[in-house]
Amino acid sequence: MRRLLALALLLPIVGGQGGARAEPQQMVAAAHPLAVEAGLDVLRRGGSAVDAAVAVQMMLGVVEPHSSGIGGGGFLLYYDAGTRGIAVYDGREAAPAGATPTMFLHDGRPLPFLDAVASGLSVGVPGAVALLEMAHREHGKLPWADLFTSSIGVARKGFPVSPRLAFWLETIKRLGSEPAARTIYFNEDGSPKKTGERIANPALAGTMERIAAEGARVLREGPIAEEMAARVRGHERPGTLAAADLAAYKPVKREPLCGPYRIWIVCGMPPPSSGGIAILQMLGLLEPFDLRKDKPNDLRALHLIAEAGRLAFADRARYVADPAFVAVPTRQLVAPGYIAERRKLISEDKSMGEQGPVAPGYVEHGTSHMTIVDRAGNAVAFTTTIEGPFGAQMMVGGFILNNELTDFSEVAERDGKPVANRVGPGKRPRSSMSPTFVLDRERKLVLSVGSAGGQRIIGDTLQALVGMLDWNLSAQAALDLPRVANMNGPTELEDKGDLPAQADALRKLGHQVQVRRHEGGLTAVRRKGDGWEGGADPRRDGVAKGE
């Protein structure tokens, strides 16, 4: 473990800085140095990009437990360099069979959001491990059990608390009321662990040892599954999760959602994620305005990006949900003719204001994204989550349970019509996760990108794409950009650099502007010469490293 930590501390924070040396032929970008080193260790041993993703996820569950882990879910894109095809894996959490459209109401009114989060009501059936098991079965090279060695070692021996983990432990102090979490993340006097203090999680090490030996069925049946169900049903605000729900869960393979942007093909996640639709819509809306004429942070670019986001989020709220329950008009929403009609609503001189259904205003700070390319050129873009910081704030087997069901709409009807994203038994809640590949016209991989950050994922990923494709920025420079976003409400400007200085000019165009802190969570890998460069969001603890 000491060797792993020492190597991780030497990792450069940006990719592609190598001067005259050959560009890296394999790359890992993730939210923590130890996770990056775990992935690289697998690649050095001849593992595939999917093998590395398993190792990275397991390590993130140890060192970034506030964002993702065994108790959550995610979406994974896999690029096969040999066939130039894309496989899509949906490991989104699902509502239990006992879920109802009114479960988040109390006396006919929505529960306070944070009360719903920290409750048994919010916990969905986790799917991250099942997703990884399916992807590994199809694209793994190393034995499944060999991919857990690094994370088990760190969980047993301990690791220093990162600045971001320390921040969220200080912020979510109610986590200390969970006995299992208190013994791991808090001191004897009840104070949260601080940056640099050491944490070990032997319970999680034991759970991972079982998963390494037996696979995802450990979470579907047996003692851990039974404990999950009992913990959720025994909460003071109980949910309905049952052992039968865990046993019935299956990840889903889907078709990628792809569309053109200038000379490239952009591919993302279809529903129940809204990310693929929204990003293709926004790129289609923006293409005729030719953002190459602008510089980053120019008023025109900020205005147009915000207006495109406004329209995409209006459609997201109205149409997008789990396609097993709702007929989502996916192809119509990204059709050139439809996008051209929507584009008529955009003026370069004035904001259009709110359009149709408005997205809820809660900002989610959880989730993690990894970007991996192996030596053969195969790639993974994997967005993984337990939803909010520390999910539902409950622990079983050393891992945090998700609060993913709060991604459903609170109300079942609006204006007398069913809401697409209403709660339903077995249904997967709508997501904003946006793992994205960009290919050239020969379907060779150009870049891979994705982000954490709840609904802000879509705008952050879009802005990174614009930075790399339109402004020809390096992967790291694109991720460093100050952020602008509009989710069919106020236009949000990050309180960074010279971006806040544009607030008054945007207000003159009719925008309601909020200047606020932003966490981000992007990672990216981009082709450079005969190799790759990488980037990791400077707002978090992550790095990108290639060899």
Q: What is the predicted role of each segment?
A:
Residues K253, E364-T367, S431-M433:
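Short, small/polar residue-rich loop motifs at catalytic or cofactor-binding pockets
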Residues V62-G69, G73-V88, L105, G239-A242, ...:
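Active-site rim segments in enzyme catalytic domains, especially the processed small/beta chain
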Residues G426-R428, T461, D470-R517:
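Extended C-terminal subregions enriched in glycine
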Residues C267-G276, S368-T371, A381-Q393, S451-I458:
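Glycine-rich phosphate/pyrophosphate-binding beta-alpha loops
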Residues R21-E37, D41, A49-E214, L219-E221, ...:
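Noncatalytic scaffold domains of N-terminal-nucleophile
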Residues P288-T385, D537:
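Internal maturation/activation junctions in enzymes
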Residues L5-G16:
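Bacterial N-terminal signal peptides
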